[in-house]
Amino acid sequence: AIGRTWQCGTIQLDMLMPERFNLEYIGEDGEKHRPVMIHRVVYGSIERFIGILIEHFAGAFPTWLAPVQAVVIPIKTDSEAQMVYAKELMAKLDAAGIRAKLDDRNETLGYRIREQQGQKVPYMLVIGDKEAESNMVSVRDRKDREEFKNPVTAEDFILYAADEIKERRL
C-alpha cells in the first residue's frame, strides 16, 4: 500500500554464529570444520501477514474480513421501541452469520456515526421510530455505494450483506 517490501518467513544461511560459538565438527577427512547454520524463521509470519493486510486496506477491510461487519445504531437509546427492534435486528444479523455490534451508548447520534466511520465499519444500520415500526433499516455504507435506496427492509439488507460476505467481494 505504501510501496514497502515485506518479509514473512525466511530461511537463512548463517556463517557468523558458528564462529562466535566456536562450533566445530569432525569431517570425513578427520579434520575439524566450521559448520554453516541454517535458520528458518516462520515465527511472526502470521503477525507480519496481518500487518500487511492492515496496511494494504488501510484498516478498511472488505466486509467479509472486517472484524465488525455492521453496527446497529438506534437514534434514541432511551426509546424502548428502538432498543427492542435493535436487539431483534442484532439477533437476525447473528443468525445470518454477520458480525455485528450494537452501539447503544449515551452519546449523540452524530458522535456515534463519526466514531464508527473512524473504525471503518462497512455498514452502519441506523434505526429510528419509523424503521422500528416498519422492520426497516437506514443503511450508511462506508463506501457510499448506491445499492441502498433507504430505508430498506432488514431482510433485504441481511440478504445483500450475507451474499457479499459469502462471495468475498472487495
Segments predicted by a language model, with ranges:
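NTP/phosphate- and nucleic-acid-binding module
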Residues: 1-170
